[in-house]
């Protein structure tokens, strides 16, 4: 099963390699601007948040945001472009590559984009700050970042499969994806919400992702329930992505 998926993934990685410099500049600019404006520019006015400097509080969230947003965007636009413009998906279907392999390949591509771009932002942020983390903290953080990127990559495959107009894809990102990211405690602790809303926000897998990733990287904690929530959601969305893509291709 993975031989065909790996071939498609390798093709997408070769495309990324050709434009890696421009991609890195573009992807680093936005989170770095936010970090400089809020993390450094306003840290004197905000003070400590959950016992840590505000610039440290938002750093893991910005890295995670970059990774999952890149994973989602790559999966969505790559699949849509190859399905509606280049018709590469139709070319894949006349080869011995099975439908699940195409889905797995696109998920792997989005996932890889997310990790590479998240790493780039992390290196830049760590280069301009005095904050350092132990390798064990980083391993705990990756336990959230990897399934989180896979989750958003699977969601991107679903959007790229069912949506035929690029403006619709843009609306979904603006109305659903970005609010889910920003509402999950990226810039503020969940305690800022009214007590009646907190349980609903905590039920979101994105909250488990961002809160768990922050705890893992900053304090070395590992909230098992949050990690399981992210991983189980990723598996469910993956199954949905395969089913929806197979259904779409059978039309």
For every predicted segment, state its role.
Residues 1-211, 215-251:
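Hydrophobic transmembrane alpha-helices and immediately adjacent juxtamembrane helices
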């Amino acid at each position: 099963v993975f031989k065909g998926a790996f071939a498609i993934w390798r093709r997408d990685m070769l495309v990324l390699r050709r434009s890696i410099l421009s991609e890195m500049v573009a992807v680093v600019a936005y989170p770095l601007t936010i970090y400089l404006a809020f993390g450094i520019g306003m840290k004197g006015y905000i003070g400590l948040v959950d016992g840590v400097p505000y610039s440290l509080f938002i750093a893991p969230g910005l890295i995670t945001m970059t990774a999952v947003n890149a994973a989602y965007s790559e999966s969505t636009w790559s699949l849509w472009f190859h399905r509606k413009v280049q018709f590469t998906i139709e070319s894949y279907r006349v080869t011995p590559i099975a439908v699940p392999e195409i889905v797995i390949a696109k998920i792997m591509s989005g996932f890889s984009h997310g990790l590479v771009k998240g790493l780039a932002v992390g290196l830049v942020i760590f280069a301009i700050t005095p904050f350092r983390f132990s390798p064990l903290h980083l391993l705990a953080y990756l336990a959230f970042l990897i399934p989180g990127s896979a989750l958003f990559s699977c969601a991107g495959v679903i959007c790229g499969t069912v949506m035929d107009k690029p403006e619709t894809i843009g609306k979904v990102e603006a109305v659903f994806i970005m609010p889910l990211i920003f509402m999950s405690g990226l810039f503020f602790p969940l305690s800022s919400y009214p007590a009646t809303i907190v349980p609903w926000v905590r039920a979101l897998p994105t909250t488990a992702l961002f809160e768990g990733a922050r705890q893992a990287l900053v304090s070395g904690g590992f909230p098992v329930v949050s990690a399981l929530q992210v991983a189980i959601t990723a598996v469910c969305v993956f199954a949905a992505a395969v089913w929806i893509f197979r259904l779409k291709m059978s039309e």
